[in-house]
Amino acid sequence: MSEQFTRREFLQSACITMGALAVSTSGVDRAFASSSLPINTSGIPSCDVLIIGSGAAGLRAAVAARKKDPSLNVIVVSKVMPTRSATTMAEGGINGVIDFSEGDSFALHAYDTVKGGDFLVDQDTAMKFAEHAGEAIHELDYIGMPFSRDKNGKVDKRYAGGASKIRCNFSADKTGHILTHTCLDDALKNGVKFLMDHQLLDIGVDNGRCEGVVLRDIRTGTIAPVRAKSVVLATGGYTRVFWNRTSTPYIATGDGAASAMRAGVAFKDPEMLQFHPTGVCHGGVLITEAARGEGGILLNNQGERFMKNYAKKMELAPRDIVSRSIETEIREGRAFGKGMEAYVLLDVTHLGKEKIMRNLPQIRHIGLLFENMDLVEKPIAIRPTAHYSMGGIDVMGLESMSTAIPGLFAAGEAACVSIHGANRLGGNSLCDTVVTGKIAGTNAASFASSAGFGSGTHLHDLTLKWMSRFKEVANGKGEVNEMYAIREELGAVNWDNMGVFRTESRLVALEDKHNELQARYDALRIPNTNPVFNTAFTEYVELGNILLASRAARMGAEARKESRGSHYREDYIKRDDANFLKHSMVTMDSNGKLHLGWKDVVVTQFKIEERKY
């Protein structure tokens, strides 16, 4: 493979990162200029701390790294601008105990998190997380996040599903959007540099430690190695395995988890995918849990508030319970419409226009935009949609956020430190991003401060491999729509066989379908040979990643012969703590074969008990 490229060609490719963007003298433009990647003595671009992903986790990691050691060159790499990250789509709020006057506590937040995750949560991690969460809210308030305020001027709170106390701090129903802008402003203020429109291809490992990554400039098509003393993966989740039946952006293709697996890191609990109860019927766009937190109710085609039949907390039961309840209503004929068009109603009309416009303005806009209806006046059609990845890159613990590979860290939804277990509570995801992002960035900076660069040998080989792969795949001979057909089929079969309800027979059949789709993917060729803005190749790489994530999730789902949280097996409807109070751990060998192992859940202070709401 290496004979296909001269050293001159290789270094030209590596150095193109230097001039990919015009350098501007203004602060913001300069921060987003790719010239912030210096060239080291090997002729390969490098930096001290490289962060992949520009959502809240990546931004908080970058700021933490800069604050830990201001002398470090910290670069954030992303496929899109930070304001287009998945974080901006989070609406409801961010959990954190900052008011103890109503009997709330860190221990109660931790218990709610453990119970909400159906006891697949590592309890020591949950306790530390709850303690960090309150601190994170104060820190965000300090750096200027414009939270909604109560009549006393304090940060306002609302209930979220599965919470025993009111601790979900919010900014109307745009909390993620506002959080992103706050974190981006803070990153720019602290001298963080950005490399936009770049795609992660692979992670280099040299003598057992991370030596950097291989990136592709989406605009020019240039494939280049970037050496780094430490790397933080903050690439988000992988719910695009369901393709169009998800509330997450198109970039949520598991790039970090797939790359980490290829580098030798385990994929923990990949089968744990959350289905949010209230996605807009046509398209899956999210209607925030805040709508139910503010008093919204769910109705079937008989006008019945059906959640009273499933849980005492009704609409504020955890998401997995509400999602299964809605799907049961659909299955048993008490929904509106049929098939993929079936739905129930979310009604907030009784809240009144003033309250909706004050606390839920964005969901009103979503209703008008996607359903051409005003939820001030009538209920909106909803059904469950894939929303969040509880599984992810295995990290060693909350206090480090480091992987098994020295110098490689992970944060946010990309990581699985076992905060969320089998079901994430509403409001815990945004908190996860800022808590784990800060910890990962701090430790990545500490590692980089005392580490040197790797040899670059593995990065060199990986870069040549990807350059060859582009030439092989983008050869102009492929069928125009084949890639999109594979992607649509993958999403559909995953939803049908690995969605809200799962069985052995469906999961076994899904393995055969995955093998068929993988074979078609391996033979796939792209009609566009031009490297410049070759979005087909961008999507080709992403499709490979969601195929790998799908295979890992299916393997975990078949092996876990129980029902727990979001993982519901109709052939094993009971939770089985004796055999499955364990994390599934999927690894990949050098031949691309997947292997499944198990790791015990950490149980400390909370008794394992039946989960009731």
Swiss-Prot record:
- Its signal peptide is 1-33
The catalysed reaction is:
8-methylmenaquinone-6 + succinate = 8-methylmenaquinol-6 + fumarate
- Chief location of this protein within or outside the cell: periplasm
What kind of modification does the protein receive after translation? Predicted to be exported by the Tat system. The position of the signal peptide cleavage has not been experimentally proven.
Query: A GO CC term?
Result: periplasmic space
Which gene name belongs to this protein?
A: sdhA
Query: Required co-factor?
Result: FAD
What function does this protein fulfil?
A: Flavoprotein subunit of 8-methylmenaquinol:fumarate reductase (MFR), that catalyzes the reduction of fumarate using 8-methylmenaquinol-6 as electron donor. The complex shows no succinate oxidation activity. Is involved in anaerobic metabolism. SdhA contains the dicarboxylate reduction site.
Q: How does it assemble?
A: The MFR complex is composed of three subunits: a flavoprotein (SdhA), an iron-sulfur protein (SdhB), and one hydrophobic anchor protein (SdhE).
Name of this protein: 8-methylmenaquinol:fumarate reductase flavoprotein subunit
Residue positions annotated to bind FAD are: 53-58, 78-93, 255, 413, 429-430
Q: Please give the PROSITE patterns that the UniProt record associates with this protein.
A: TAT
Tell me the membrane topology, using the record's own terms. Peripheral membrane protein
Q: What keywords were assigned to this record?
A: Cell membrane, Electron transport, FAD, Flavoprotein, Membrane, Oxidoreductase, Periplasm, Signal, Transport
Q: Which residues bind substrate?
A: 276, 288, 387, 424
Similarity field: Belongs to the FAD-dependent oxidoreductase 2 family. FRD/SDH subfamily.
Instruction: Name where it's found.
Output: Periplasm; Cell membrane
Provide one Gene Ontology biological process annotation.
anaerobic respiration
